[in-house]
């Protein structure tokens, strides 16, 4: 196993996991003629919140 090295993140980048539901909906998004609508049915595994399953 190789030794660990310290990596410095650039300014403005925060490591970590963001809550998914904060990132997938953008209410001020303006649609374009080239946008494509796609729909998928997702069934979460037991214990997984529906918004995290997608």
UniProtKB/Swiss-Prot annotation:
Q: State which residues form the propeptide.
A: 1-2
The alphabetized UniProt keywords are: Acetylation, Calvin cycle, Carbon dioxide fixation, Chloroplast, Lyase, Methylation, Monooxygenase, Oxidoreductase, Photorespiration, Photosynthesis, Plastid
Question: What are the N-acetylproline sites (modified residues) in this protein?
Answer: 3
Give the UniProt record's GO annotations in the biological process aspect. Answer: photorespiration; reductive pentose-phosphate cycle
Q: What is its EC number?
A: 4.1.1.39
Modified residue annotations for N6,N6,N6-trimethyllysine: 14
* One GO MF term: monooxygenase activity
Q: Which residues form a coiled coil?
A: none
Primary localisation category: plastid
Catalytic activity of the protein: 2 (2R)-3-phosphoglycerate + 2 H(+) = D-ribulose 1,5-bisphosphate + CO2 + H2O; D-ribulose 1,5-bisphosphate + O2 = 2-phosphoglycolate + (2R)-3-phosphoglycerate + 2 H(+)
Check the UniProt entry and state the signal peptide residues, or none.
none
Q: What else is known?
A: The basic functional RuBisCO is composed of a large chain homodimer in a 'head-to-tail' conformation. In form I RuBisCO this homodimer is arranged in a barrel-like tetramer with the small subunits forming a tetrameric 'cap' on each end of the 'barrel'.
User: Quaternary arrangement and interactors, per the entry?
Assistant: Heterohexadecamer of 8 large chains and 8 small chains.
Please give the function described in this protein's UniProt entry: RuBisCO catalyzes two reactions: the carboxylation of D-ribulose 1,5-bisphosphate, the primary event in carbon dioxide fixation, as well as the oxidative fragmentation of the pentose substrate in the photorespiration process. Both reactions occur simultaneously and in competition at the same active site.
Q: What is this protein called?
A: Ribulose bisphosphate carboxylase large chain
Organism from which the protein derives: Ilex ciliospinosa (Sichuan holly)
Encoding gene, per UniProt annotation = rbcL
């Amino acid at each position: 196993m190789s030794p660990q090295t310290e990596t410095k993140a650039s300014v403005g980048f925060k490591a970590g996991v963001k809550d998914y539901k904060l990132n997938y909906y953008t209410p001020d998004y303006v649609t374009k003629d080239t946008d494509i609508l796609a729909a998928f049915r997702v069934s979460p595994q037991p214990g997984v919140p529906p918004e995290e399953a997608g």
